[in-house]
């Protein structure tokens, strides 16, 4: 488990039991094809989340070309949930711009535009529908956050 570390340790399972239930709820609603696990390096460099803001996380993305599907659950440090959510929104905007460069990725771009980012207490979630997803992700997020 991470705690105010200067850098997230690579190669560790950075999830905690508290993240498993919301993660599984979201993954059930939004099955991700050809999954790859989001690594500590991605948390810091792709999402630009400072290590001191992240206690733990669990996430997967689709490794399929043109499928932006993703489920990410972050346990933010005390008082950092809103900052983490804001940084995930910045990531979302970057991804919208990226997919906008490719006409063949119109579905992925739309899915990123409609991503759901929410937080409750120190738990922050970001869900991008996979191309195959038909579930209502808003209600899945509410359920995952115990709303």
Annotated model-derived regions:
Residues 13, 17, 37, 78-82, ...:
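Soluble non-cytosolic domains of exported or imported proteins
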């Amino acid at each position: 488990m991470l705690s105010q570390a200067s850098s997230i340790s690579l190669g560790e399972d950075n999830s905690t039991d508290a993240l498993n239930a919301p993660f599984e709820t979201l993954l059930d609603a939004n099955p991700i094809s050809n999954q790859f696990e989001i690594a500590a390096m991605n948390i810091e460099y792709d999402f630009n989340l400072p290590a001191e803001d992240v206690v733990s996380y669990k996430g997967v993305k689709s490794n399929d070309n043109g499928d932006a599907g993703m489920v990410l659950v972050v346990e933010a440090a005390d008082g950092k949930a809103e900052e983490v959510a804001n940084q995930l929104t910045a990531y979302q905007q970057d991804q919208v711009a990226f997919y906008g460069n490719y006409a063949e990725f119109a579905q992925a771009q739309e899915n990123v535009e409609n991503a759901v980012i929410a937080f409750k207490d120190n738990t922050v979630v970001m869900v991008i529908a996979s191309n195959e997803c038909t579930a209502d992700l808003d209600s899945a997020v509410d359920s995952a956050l115990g709303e």
